[in-house]
Every structure is written in structure tokens, then in C-alpha cells.
Curated annotation (Swiss-Prot):
This protein's name: Flagellar hook-basal body complex protein FliE
Subcellular location: Bacterial flagellum basal body
Keyword vocabulary terms for this entry: Bacterial flagellum
GO molecular function: cytoskeletal motor activity; structural molecule activity
A Gene Ontology cellular-component term: bacterial-type flagellum basal body
Stored InterPro entries: FliE
Location, primary (coarse class): other
UniProt organism field: Sinorhizobium fredii (strain NBRC 101917 / NGR234)
Similarity field: Belongs to the FliE family.
Pfam family, one: FliE
GO biological process, one term: bacterial-type flagellum-dependent cell motility
Amino acid sequence: MIDAIQSVGAFSNLKEAEGTSLTASTALSLPSAGASAPQSQSFAEVLGTMTTDAIRSMKSAEGVSLQAIRGEANTREVVDAVMNAEQSLQTALAIRDKVVTAYLEIARMQI
């Protein structure tokens, strides 16, 4: 179910064009104590990482739910996984709403 959502994502085309997959893990790196300049990421990379984490969270919740149906997971594990996935989804929706609002404001500007 989540794989279908992943193929529709806006970042799947971007990552495939760059030669990497959306499912590839891209973690945020913290600069080391001896580093002279902090390493920055582009906005697309940050959103891609957040999207990957949200998809991974939803897949995990789906897997735990299936384990519970088979009797291999208890209720607490299912609730924790589903709540984590719900929080990730709510964050993604909030970011989407902010991006759409910003786009609409830019579109209304007179040039």
C-alpha cells in the first residue's frame, strides 16, 4: 500500500534523476568538532529525507499491524507504531500546507 504512495511522490523523480533511489537512506550529518565549516543540505534533500522517514514509519506501522493480526505483536506495540506513523503523517501534511500557502502567496504577488 505504501509503495503505491512512494511512486507518486514528487521526490521520486528528482532522486531517480540524480541516480539515487527514494528508499536510500540519507541521514542528516552533524559537523564534527574539528570541522571548520558546517556542511549544509539543500531544501530538496531535507524534504526528501523527511519523506523517506515518513514512508519508513508508515511501512513499520503496517508491518506491526500485520504481526498483530497473526498474533505475533501485542496491542501496545501496534499503538506505538500507529501513533508514530500518524505523527509523521501529520507533520508531512503541515509542511505540505505551508508550502502550498507560500506558493499561493508568491503567485498572487504583482510583478
